[in-house]
Amino acid sequence: MSSGNPFDNGNPNDGNKSPSIDELYSPSESLARDGDDNNNNNNNNNNNNNNNNNNNNSSVSEKKKSKKKVRIQEEERLTESYDDDGDDEERRAYIENEEGEEEETEDGIILQPIVRDHSTYRPKNLYGSSDDIREGDSFGAKVSKTFGKTNKKIKQKIGESNKKIETRVKHSNKAIEEGWKTIAQTTMKPVDNIREQHHRRAEQHEVAERAVWFKDKLQIQKYECLDYVTIYNKAHRNELYKNFSKLASDHEVLRWIVSLFMGIFIGVIAYFSHACVSNITKYKFKFVEAVLELDLFLAFLTYFLLNTLLATCSSLLAVYYEPTAAGSGIPEVKGYLNGTKIPHTLKMKTLWTKFLSMVLAVSSGLQAGSEGPMIHIGAIVGNGFSQAQSKEFGFKIPFLRSFRNDKDKRDFVTSGAGAGVAAAFSAPLGGTLFSLEEVSSFWSIALTWRAFFCCMVATYTMNVLQSNSGSLTGLIIFNTGIGDKESYNWFEIIPFLLIGVLGGLGGALFTWINVKVTEFRREKINKIKSLRVLEVFLIIGLSTCIQFFLPLFFSCQNTAPFIPSVGNSTLTDVTLTNGAFYNSTIINGTFYNSTIANGTIYNSKFYNSSIYNSTITNGTGVSYDPAETLKELSEFKRFNCKEGWYNPMATLIFASYEESITNLLKVNSNNVTNTERLGLWPMFLFCIFYLFFAAYTAGCAVATGTLVPMLVIGASYGRFVGLVVYHILGDKVSIDPGIYAVMGAAAFMGGVSRLTISLTVILIEITDRLKYLLPLMLTVMTAKWVADALIHPLFDLLMQMKYIPYLELDQSKEMKLMMCKHIMAKKPVYLAEKDTLGNLRVLKETRHNGFPVVNNDEEKLVKGLILRTQLLMILERISDVYIPNSEAIYSHIEYTTKLTWKLPSVNDFNFDPADYSQEIDLSDVMNLTVITVNVEFAVSEAFQLFRTMGLRHMPVVNENNKLKGIITKKDLLEKTCEQRYRELNHMKLGIDQLIHVGDE
């Protein structure tokens, strides 16, 4: 091997030698880059290589040049980084790798592997000729060159060190990256499994949701919708023309007269229900207390038997006699006023069953109230009085025929529902607003005045009857003394807001429990009637045990601090306990632990009176009504305590709901401080007990409501918060737990029902203090906001669980992305203007209640719409249809009257097949004012048309008015649109593809 060129791998004189690396490249690209000491030798080698390169350059392709160039550049890198610390190993490995390359053939020239001797490598010369120190150099130049060499050497070492560090860092980073990849793969495997499981569960959930929706859809189909849209056809126009002068005045006067009688009748029913409940409850507790004086266990058996007997009888009525009477009836009334026809909801049979079941259930001690049934009863009264007819009793009054349509009936039902609330709470304005805010879906100014008038009459009737019977006014809330209370402190807004938050959370919990219980009943209990009765028996049995035995764990308290002093009074035939008297005349009185103050016995007159353990001392007293003292004494429950003492838990739980609310809302007065009359633990346990039992009881097989339990639960936790604040602040400020109880009652009721304005007005009316308007509104709004963030309102969820089609006030977000062609029925059943009798077989073949009427089968241009009920009447009076210009032709007023009474079934008609070809003209009967929309019409806007106008059917047409489909109320339900959007979203379409879904 020649020593002249370290890269030469053969005899230089051999004609078949392979070209060297330097022969393939120009001198500027060679590896000879040594210092000036080796320049001459390298130049000679380069010249020789250039000569050889010129001879063979034409036979080497540019591709191989590029490849060799890459190799040379790599060798340059290795040569420049050569040192004794390990880079030589890398260079040697590279050379051995190059020696292992296979032969390559290019254009007939065999390229031999290049063999390189690594021992000939020398490090690159660090210094150039300019760095040499010459004799003629000045001292400064010598110093500069010396430092320059040193600097270059230092830079070289630094560069070499940096390259080593960089190389090692690269290796470390690569190792770390590989390690992280290994860790990530190990970690992501379970994550991927979890993601896959989640995706699989999501698919299973979607399949389950779809199955549930199809099941719910079948349940929804059993309900029909009401016709709130007036049918304007030729027959109706003729009737309007004939009676045009009587249209406005007569009908409006009749509406006010009907509203008057509705209010009176609802007030009478409210009074009798209240009187029955009060008397049954009063005598029940008196009897149990009398037995309690004899034996505790015997008193429990008596209390248990009485409660279970009353509750079971109530359940038997609601299960076997009229099942529609069970529950509060509010979801059914809301659904009806939204446009859904619910069978048996407004029948007189339902009213009497509701009344009796409500009286028995509330008297039994169930955690339920009477206001919900009163709303339902008021709605039934509104329906019955407006129609002036009854199928059960078989009578009709002809002069109210003009109100026998769904639209007028809806208005009277709305007024009746509000009057039921007004009579229950003695709040006419609150009842009107409740009807507007909660149950009604369609409202007008004229309806507002009539509804308010009906509520005033119902409240006045109720109060007059109660005042004549010696009772206090109001069915739900009695005189609590709140009206005499001074205004609140500004810092109390903070605990009021806390009460609002707790009301929202508690209301959401109450709703969730009731929904879960309702689902359980629907799947396990409601299918068997006997189980429904057994459930009521178990509920009242367990509740009775807790009501009776829980007070035994609480100690007795003295009633003296909570009884006002009595002076300058005359009392006759009474029994007084722990009273203070002076200058009084007492006749036939009995005194226990009493104080007679201010003077000697000669200052007072006693006739046939007995004094036990009493003290006659000097003292002072104030004038006070003795009847009020008797009332105060009746609010305390002795239970197992001695005379003059009471049990705080029995005062709450061993009492009627009226007495419980009265004690909870009791505020301080000038004579008595009621802060400590009910302690913290009784408040807490009573709230928990009532919350869970009321949530479970609501919806069972008895006629009960939930509004009163909401008030009781809210008042209990509100008073509890007030007591906590009182114990924290002490006597520094005036804290009245009774005010906190009012705020709690409003908050919890708002958290469950989401009522705001009507609830605030009702509580303002029953407390008679406008100064609490601001804190009440803040508390109620806070409760509503918190509950809205957690769950839907209770009555809306109950309607969904009962499969009642209901259009909410606001449309869902999915509706804004869809068009009518996405949700419409694609193949609507239609009739022609002039059709045949045989084509009316669609009444038997389908369950549709509305049919678009087109001009003919070819063009299918929409001309109107006809209802199933109209076709049934045509079939019934088919002979009249063919008499043109006759009075016997289809009559609109007769149709509406027939509709509210009884129409024949399609199976009642049997026509001769020979008559099937007979032509029927529907142009005089069909509704000419049918509303149609284009296939591209937004679903959200179609929803607004249905919601505001009370539509039942909406044909869908193209730009030429050709029938393409039909939309009904059930197609616009929130769940329906969500399911349809989910199906479209599952297709993963863009907005452009989504627009064209449904096109032909």
Curated annotation (Swiss-Prot):
Q: Identify the GO cellular component terms for this protein.
A: chloride channel complex; intracellular membrane-bounded organelle
Biased composition, class Basic and acidic residues, residue ranges: 71-80
Pfam short name (any one): Voltage_CLC
Keyword Transcription recorded: no
Recorded topology in the membrane: Multi-pass membrane protein
For biological process, the GO terms are: sorocarp development
Q: Which residues form the CBS domain?
A: 824-881, 926-984
The cross-references to PROSITE patterns, in alphabetical order and at most eight, read: CBS
Membrane-spanning ranges: 257-277, 290-310, 416-436, 442-462, 493-513, 534-554, 678-698, 710-730, 733-753, 772-792
Sorted UniProt keywords: CBS domain, Chloride, Chloride channel, Ion channel, Ion transport, Membrane, Repeat, Transmembrane, Transmembrane helix, Transport, Voltage-gated channel
Q: Which residues lie on this side of the membrane: Cytoplasmic?
A: 1-256
Q: What happens when the gene is disrupted?
A: Cells display slow oscillators with delayed aggregation.
User: Which Gene3D superfamilies does the record cross-reference, listed alphabetically?
Assistant: CBS-domain, Clc chloride channel
Statement: the UniProt record of this protein carries the keyword Protease? no
Enumerate the subcellular locations listed in this protein's record, separating them with semicolons: Membrane
Query: Molecular function terms in GO for this entry?
Result: chloride channel activity; chloride transmembrane transporter activity
Give the top-rank taxon of the lineage listed in the UniProt record for this protein: Eukaryota
Report the main location listed first in the record. membrane
Q: Which family does it belong to?
A: Belongs to the chloride channel (TC 2.A.49) family.
General function of this protein: Voltage-gated chloride channel. Chloride channels may have several functions including the regulation of cell volume, membrane potential stabilization and signal transduction. Required for normal aggregation.
The protein, known as: Chloride channel protein D
Q: What is the lineage of its organism?
A: Eukaryota, Amoebozoa, Evosea, Eumycetozoa, Dictyostelia
Q: Which gene encodes it?
A: clcD
